[in-house]
């Protein structure tokens, strides 16, 4: 991770400095509700992000953000705070094999850190 200031260097721990962007916090976050590996997909990792002044879906994204870290966190790679009049968009292409689901099972997308309002698009449909 790129460090932007001498103060920011103090915020990193040994673990933060050595984080693997392709393998970020892959364990299931609630040990008492642990899922089988074939029924759980962790969405942590690199996503595209965009800050916008409009609630319209952006055409272009500003760059990459490392999830699960918030944009303000140095480990996110963004180091920017969302302003009150802005919207924050994330985008990532994820492929799931729906055929793996049994007839009586459900497909659930869980976001553990949505603070306000969230709109989810699947195959471009809200």
Task: Enumerate the language-model features and the residues they cover.
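Accessory beta-strand-rich segments of carbohydrate-active enzymes
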Residues: 2-20, 33-35, 48-54, 80-126
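Core domains of carbohydrate- and sulfate-ester-processing enzymes
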Residues: 38-87
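Short glycine/threonine/proline-enriched tight-turn/helix- or strand-capping micro-motif at secondary-structure
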Residues: 25-30, 73-77
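Short, compositionally biased strand/turn segments
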Residues: 24-25, 47
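A generic signature of intrinsically disordered, low-complexity regions enriched in glycine/proline
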Residues: 24, 40, 68, 76, ...
């Amino acid at each position: 991770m790129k460090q932007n200031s001498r103060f920011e260097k103090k915020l990193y721990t040994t673990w933060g400095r050595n984080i693997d962007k392709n393998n970020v916090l892959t364990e299931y976050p609630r040990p008492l509700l642990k899922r089988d590996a074939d029924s759980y997909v962790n969405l942590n990792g690199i996503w595209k992000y965009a800050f916008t002044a409009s609630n319209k879906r952006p055409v272009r994204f500003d760059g990459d953000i490392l999830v699960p870290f918030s944009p303000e966190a140095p480990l996110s790679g963004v180091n920017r705070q969302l302003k009150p009049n802005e919207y924050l968009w994330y985008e990532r292409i994820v492929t799931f094999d729906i055929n793996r689901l049994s007839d009586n099972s459900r497909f659930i997308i869980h976001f553990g850190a949505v603070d306000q309002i969230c709109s989810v698009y699947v195959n471009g449909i809200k």
